[in-house]
From Swiss-Prot:
Family matches, as Gene3D superfamilies: 3.40.50.2020
Keywords, alphabetical: Allosteric enzyme, Glycosyltransferase, GTP-binding, Magnesium, Nucleotide-binding, Transferase
Protein family (similarity comment): Belongs to the UPRTase family.
Cofactor comment text: Binds 1 Mg(2+) ion per subunit. The magnesium is bound as Mg-PRPP.
Highest taxon of the lineage: Bacteria
Positions annotated to bind uracil: 197, 202-204
Protein name: Uracil phosphoribosyltransferase
EC number(s) per entry: 2.4.2.9
Gene Ontology molecular function: GTP binding; magnesium ion binding; uracil phosphoribosyltransferase activity
Pfam family for this entry, one: UPRTase
Cofactor(s) required, per the database record: Mg(2+)
């Protein structure tokens, strides 16, 4: 697994605003979108391209185009949805699939409750979106799911990660025979006894969309 912790002043600035308890949901959503677009620039560095010819107003010239099959963006529900627009802003021709993964608050293990993905992902580059890499279970379970369907290159984008989550995720994917890249905007200190990232930014889903009773 290849880890990239982003080092950019705008990333740090937006992450600081996201952490603030005083940032309301509408502003939080906008900041997430902006931050993910910055992350997507780095995350798509290895997106597959092929030569093509384009005609300018003056002449024909060589260029590149994204290869087929198209990249697949996979937000993990529900918080991952908040990252989708920022990703699609940079790569609008990508297709989108969904995985519903929730954490059992007693065992801290991931549970899949929904999925909407192509049955065959052979030859697909997949971009998995999950704001918080805490225990690593949800992200690792999603990556394993995609690999079983044939995905051969996976990049995961997370806004925050805990060291424990990165280590657990590394263990979960180390035996997978596909390249796996992890892009994080910030690396925090640790997990608390409830499995939450500290200092963190709170529950990303609740801060994006409010608390669903």
């Amino acid at each position: 697994m290849e880890l990239n912790v982003m080092d950019h002043p705008l990333v740090s600035h937006k992450l600081t605003l996201l952490r603030s308890v005083d940032t309301p949901s509408p502003v939080f959503r906008q900041l997430v979108e902006e931050l993910v677009t910055l992350m997507a620039y780095e995350g798509t560095r290895e997106v597959r391209i092929e030569p093509t010819t384009v005609t300018t107003p003056l002449t024909a010239t060589e260029g590149v185009a994204l290869t087929r099959p198209k990249p697949l963006v996979v937000p993990i529900l529900r918080a991952g949805l908040g990252m989708l627009e920022g990703m699609m802003r940079l790569i609008p021709s990508a297709e989108v699939g969904f995985v519903g993964m929730a954490r059992d608050e007693e065992t801290l293990q991931p549970m899949t409750y929904a999925e909407r993905l192509p049955k065959d992902l052979s030859g697909r580059q997949c971009y998995v979106l999950d704001p918080m890499l805490a225990t690593g279970g949800s992200l690792g379970g999603t990556v394993e799911f995609l690999v079983r369907r044939g995905a051969d290159h996976i990049t995961c984008l997370c806004i925050l990660a805990a060291p424990e989550g990165i280590e657990n995720f590394r263990k979960l994917v180390r035996d997978l025979d596909v390249p796996c890249h992890l892009i994080v905007a910030g690396l925090d200190d640790h997990l608390d006894e409830h499995g939450y990232i500290v200092p963190g930014l709170g529950d990303a889903g609740d801060r994006l969309y409010g608390l669903a009773e």
